Amino acid sequence: PPRAQPMTSPAVTRIEVAVRPELSDARGAGVSATIRSFLGIDVGRVRTRDVYRITGELSAGEAEKVRAEFTCPVLQVSALGKLEGEHFDFAIAVGFKPGVTDPVGRSAKVAVEDTLGRKLPDRAAVYTSTLYLVDGVERDQANRIALELLANPVIQTTRIESFDEWRAAPPDLSAPVVASHDTPAVATVDLTGTDAELEALSKRKLLALSSVEMRTIRDHFRSQTSSEARRSAGLGEQPTDVELECLAQTWSEHCKHKIFNATVRYQEGEREPEVIGSVFKAYVRGTTEAVERAVIEREGRSWLVSVFHDNAGVVEHDEQHHLVYKVETHNSPSALDPYGGAMTGIVGVNRDPFGTGIGAELSSNVWGYCFASPLYSGDLPKGLLHPRRIRDGVHQGVIDGGNQSGVPYGRGWELFDSRFLGKPLVFCGTVGVLPVTVAGRPGHEKGAEPGDAIVMVGGRIGADGIHGATFSSAALDESAPIQAVQIGDPITQKRMFDFLIEARDAGLYRSITDNGAGGLSSSVGEMAEKPGGAVLDLEKAPLKYAGLAPWEILLSEAQERMTLAVTPEQIGPLLELAARREVEATVIGQFTSDGYLRVRYGGRTVGLIDMEFL
């Protein structure tokens, strides 16, 4: 029978769980079939194991208790260290890179705490990985299986060992802990260069800003009014990295839709050129307004409640409820990491109806995919995944992301065309239900006021999800950064949503929005528009780990995180409810009316941006 190999590090507890050897491993059989059909390798048997690495001190008794809790004795065997007893040709271990969200690891940490009846330290974590034991392959084939099928090098690591190498080695106790900076610092960015130098700077920092936009930012910070305000705040004429990153996010194509709003000259064949003042105004807003006029003419009233200014559209349904609907794309992230990108897409679009008005309850999801043929057999451009791998990963990510957060799927479609080889089109949509009246006020209305507290609710801030807005606004190539990809955490999001619905019905917050493509930068920046300013203290924001630079804290996005505006009178009741529901809620600043977004870190101002310029 399988036996445990002793641990070699007191700081890491390693648990390995496998299907009992006399039983069929359905997951392994599925991997084996996929290897044959996708890679054309005549592979033998594949067995799988789940590996958990728990950082932090556990006693021998505690480790054994957790091992037993993580194992179904009817179907599984497990051991502290590693299981032995099965023969195979190669072992392929697949895990996450440092800083990438590990949703199963998060849930496993909660399970460890529940099992032990005590909280683990904040710095402790559970890191998960999967071990594939493969028969009938050579080393080069094992490498292909690892890199072309089992792992995504953008977000995952692989370790490949022959049976003899694996048996001779001690248990792998390495954990993908993020290496923190010694002293997170704020840098000043020099914008005095030529247009070519400014464009190179923009590309290097993944800002997705043109040279014209870079010059505009430079000139603004040089202006007299700006300089006087900056001197009083202890800042110079050059922007800090916090300010430049915030502006790049806010001005990105992803957030500003500059192409949709630009003047377009369109000519088809020999026809006369057509000048379109704005694709958005002409074909999106214009069509909506035309339909509304027709409805008013026919029925004498409009059923549109709120369109084009909140996170999703709101239309009348009955006397008690409005319908909220939002569809968005998640193309670039799905091209890099099909499963994680698509899961992020669906849980991301979930948060838009939830952040519309004072908060809509989610009803159902929809989806639509456009890929190249899954039977494609030609060469792939560098950095691109095979269409079939993208399709299968996207579909599984969308299904898992929706169903695991309690929002079922209503309908969907797929389309295949060779033009989607370079970049897939991934639609994700959500329908929500919004009460006409909530706590004595119209459900579709919201807005922060000066003096309201800024409260961050849900998942903590990490290195993933950084530059999501600017990355998705640029052309996709092989240099795409790992930080731009975030992995959704449906369980954390579900817990947060349930808490927020309860807080909504009790009237415990005044306004809400999501931490979308720019994290706190986008949510606080958007919410500060109505009151006219905000002071945001980045040091108060809860982090997954130490060492994040201030601009990273500001920009890191997450699907399971929301920002609230809360009156001083309701802060106590809101935080008490959050504690009872085991949802993290933290006051990180205050809305003001002085016309500036002020960002603080380390007891000083590190960002001062005029709200009108932003």
Residue ranges and their predicted role:
Residues 2-488, 492, 501-506, 516, ...:
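Core nucleic-acid recognition elements
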